[in-house]
From Swiss-Prot:
Its main location: cytoplasm. It comes from the Eukaryota. It catalyses: L-glutamate + NH4(+) + ATP = L-glutamine + ADP + phosphate + H(+). This is Glutamine synthetase. It comes from Agaricus bisporus.
């Protein structure tokens, strides 16, 4: 399938005067964990989320409602600047609700918000490491030899140079777009498998972690669309001796970040161990293909922890263990997680003692 996006043809129109009106692009999570969007015109610059209307869409076309009762409502939840249109135009992350006012089954933000409201005094911070893999229009890993394979893993992680990294221009575009949009992106790097990359978002407190990661994902797939490239969040996109893709989740509370916080980190690890199976249940589909005990993972059936151990379920960074306070890294979440589910269950387990 050829790339049908014509940036050169579009550019002159994006510079046209909009008058006092702006474009607000609503973005939501569909029934299959993907992202959807549509745009409305707003009569003036938006400075507060309360100025935006509740909108609706055909949920029968997104696997979120039956055809005979298909209206699903979009309630604005967070606003970001629009890096595609510029100016005062905005991106609106929206929650989905059924016509009876209940949250749609795919709306995990609704529950997460309740959890974080309850845990607010503990100031839970998160940082997510989103790994993903790029494919070309023919579903081949981007930049790989046609009908063949690149050399074994080794030179690609944080690599530089032709043959070691692929699509750096796309990755740089995404990084800058996130910064412009107001997403708290904190870094990028090429990953162990060629054509696999990672971006980090955070630290973000509470519900904002999910908001920022979902919008960062949206920007990624939109920019990849312009390049004619596909983005896969599958945790094991290729069989064989290739690393899978995760979404390592860094977590701390106010008590963990203060002097003597190591005790609270150890307490949290004990609590996480007791609910291992419940966490795995929301840590991503097909995660068993990734959590094999190989390729820098712990086995999906076993809980483990250790200092600087990338083969453990929970890793405590060495500098954290040395200084006696900081954060922990949960290495179990897959790349295709819903961040609202992962961050909220961590807060439930470690803070609310659910």
């Amino acid at each position: 399938m050829a790339n049908t996006y014509h940036n050169d043809l579009l550019a002159p129109y994006l510079s046209l005067d909009q008058g006092d009106k702006i474009q607000a692009e609503y973005v939501w999570i569909d029934g299959d964990g993907g992202l959807r969007c549509k745009t409305t015109t707003v009569s003036k610059k938006v400075t507060d989320i309360g100025q935006l209307r509740i909108w609706d869409f055909d949920g029968s076309s997104t696997n979120q409602a039956p055809g005979h009762d298909s209206d699903v409502y979009l309630r604005p939840a967070a606003i970001f600047k629009d890096p595609f249109r510029g100016g005062d135009n905005i991106l609106v992350l929206a929650e989905t609700y059924n016509n009876d006012g209940t949250p749609n089954r795919t709306n995990h933000r609704h529950h997460a918000k309740k959890v974080f409201d309850e845990a607010k005094e503990h100031e839970p911070w998160f940082g997510l490491e989103q790994e993903y893999t790029l494919f070309d229009a023919d579903d081949q890993p981007y930049g790989w030899p046609k009908g063949g394979f690149p050399g074994p893993q080794g030179p690609y992680y944080c690599g530089a140079g032709t043959g070691k990294v692929f699509a750096r221009d796309l990755i740089e575009a995404h990084y800058r777009a996130c910064l412009y949009a107001g997403i708290n992106i904190s870094g990028i790097n090429a990953e162990v498998m060629p054509s696999q990359w990672e971006f980090q978002v955070g630290p973000c407190e509470g519900i904002s972690m999910g908001d920022h990661l979902w919008m960062a994902r949206y920007l990624l797939v939109r920019i990849a669309e312009q390049w004619g490239v596909k983005v896969s969040f599958h945790p094991k996109p290729l069989k064989g001796e290739w690393n899978g893709a995760g979404c390592h989740t860094n977590f701390s509370t106010k008590a963990m970040r203060e002097a003597g916080g190591m005790k609270f980190i150890e307490d949290a690890i004990e609590k996480l161990a007791k609910r291992h199976d419940e966490h795995i249940a929301v840590y991503g589909e097909d995660n068993d293909l990734r959590l094999t005990g190989r390729h820098e993972t712990g086995h999906i059936s076993n809980f483990s922890s250790g200092v600087a151990n990338r083969g453990a379920s929970i890793r405590v960074p060495r500098h954290v263990a040395s200084q006696g306070y900081g954060y922990l890294e949960d290495r179990r979440p897959a790349s295709n997680i819903d961040p609202y589910r992962v961050t909220s269950i961590i807060a439930e387990t470690t803070i609310l003692d659910k």
